[in-house]
Amino acid sequence: MSNLLMLLSIGLPWLGAIIIWLLGEKQRKTQHMLATLFSVAAGIASLFLLGFGSNQVTLRISMGRYFGDFTLIPDGLGVFLSAIATIVGSLTVIYSMDYMRKEAQLRRYYALVLLFIGAMAGLGLSGSLLFMFLFWEITAFCSYALISFHNDDPKAVAGGIKALIVTQLGGIGLLIGAMVIRAQIGSYQIHDFLMHARTFPPHILSLIAFGFLAAAIAKSAQVPLHTWLPDAMEAPTPVTALIHAATMVNAGVYLLARFYPALSDVPGWTISVIVVGLLSAILAALMALASNDVKRALAYSTISQLGYMVYAIGTGAVFASQFHLLSHSIFKALLFLSAGAVIQSVGTRDMRAMGSLGKDMPFVRTVFIIGCIALAGLPIANGFFSKELILEHGFVHSPRWAYLCMLIGAGITALYSVRMISMIFYGERKYIEATNDAPPAMRVSLSTLSLAVFTTWLMAGAFGNLLSNSLPFHQIQTLKVDELVLDLIAAPSTWLALLIVLIGFLFWTLRTRLRSLLGALQPLVSLTEAGFGFEQMNQGVVQVTKHLSSILRITQTGQLNWNVVGIVGGLCIVLTLLAWGV
């Protein structure tokens, strides 16, 4: 049964993509209907698959000597990621029925979205590193194509190309790691690597560990390779929700969690993961606070929340990281889709041009506030329980300075959350009025996600059991729901974190009385608005690379004689090395 459900989770979206592509552009109603049907069916299949969690390979197809076996494994991490991709993905497709109603090239949009969803499900369920890499690259292509969906907009095209290039840097790290593993044990199977990782030479394991970390940094938009994600905001809003909540950015966190047992003892690796996570959490939160574009603010918020998950993995809290991944997928999809309803109604992303829209859009205001409650980590919302689990574990298992930095990040998160609510829905009305609240299809998705914000934390016990029973190499601490609640209430770190969050709210409330403090912080504000110079740093690397390539270009004379000399000389060197047994 699990074989069928896994194939349906991956294959149904891909089958839908093919059928929709073959329909042609004129069958718009049919495209909406089929995209919804196939995505929802895949979501249902993934939901049922949660009941078949196992660490055994249930589907194996031999692909020959060089490619190894294509395997699918329904373990806890895989079925969980597949469920997020397909269920949240199906809600974005339902939302798109209204949001994309007037858009041209609807066929291309739905085909790419469904291909994206299926690839993400395949990435999670794959038992082979090589085929995980294949699905990894398909998601990269889909993100590029969807970010560049409005291909007559130079900013959208540039954003898509940037996302593709940066994430390909991470893909190189994953591919190198996979090839090294194959060279060591003769297999691409993830289970084989986790079983034999302790036998690897230290320098080989270090190469794999930091290669996978580089892959995660690029894919999950962590500092310093985070700059592609804010530029991805040129995509249609359902696409940004898909990228930021249900699909691609989750892949890097999943990669680190998947291979944590094999890599955790590599010298310097866990502290590197912690530092990457806390820098991303703090710096991105500050950039979200300084942003006036609602979608860019939410993009920086995504980077920050992913930083919490990466930090959690660095401290060994694999369960907490994945639990927060679930919470974040829900409340961030809710926030992006709510913001999309606002943007479509008022025609701008600039929060400075909004204000008092809550009177015109009471439904959207309510669901956006629900999303911010979860983002800020207030009690009763899923974000509270998952974030507090991370902070509680970090209090015990990470350096104290790292824990304090994450606490500060929690306060900044509360600050920019209330800032977004205030600028969009309250205060003085600017020169924009909303034309509608939210059409029916949008309301279905937004209502479902709002309900999930208040209920998914009840799955903590079942989710913990799923992971612990199907991940033999991981040490998963399981808690029942009542134990989770009592544990968090009793933990001093919980109350300290809530105090920091409260201080964040107070800062915004008292902002007019703190103008002198804001004046003293102006250098930090300017640095934040400049993105802390990461874009300039990345551009500097590009310029150095271009300069080096111009030097190497001298060797390309274009003369056949010299080309033949180079080929023959290189062949002689290779043959000599082979003869010496190198």
Which ranges hold each PLM region?
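Transmembrane helix-loop-helix hairpins at membrane boundaries of multipass inner-membrane proteins
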Residues: 1-8, 15-111, 183-202, 206, ...
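Hydrophobic transmembrane alpha-helices and their helix-loop junctions in integral membrane proteins
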Residues: 91-132, 141-438, 455-458
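Membrane-entry segments of alpha-helical transmembrane domains in multi-pass membrane proteins
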Residues: 1-8, 70-84, 122-134, 269, ...
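Aromatic-capped, Gly/Pro-kinked transmembrane alpha-helices
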Residues: 463-496, 502-582
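Membrane-interfacial helical/loop segments at transmembrane boundaries in membrane proteins
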Residues: 58-66, 189-196, 389-393, 463-486
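Hydrophobic alpha-helical transmembrane segments
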Residues: 72-86, 202-217, 405-410, 482-503
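Hydrophobic alpha-helical membrane-insertion segments
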Residues: 37-50, 170-179, 369-375, 445-463, ...
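Alpha-helical transmembrane segments and their helix-start/interface "positive-inside/aromatic belt" motifs
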Residues: 28-39, 159-168, 359-367, 436-451, ...
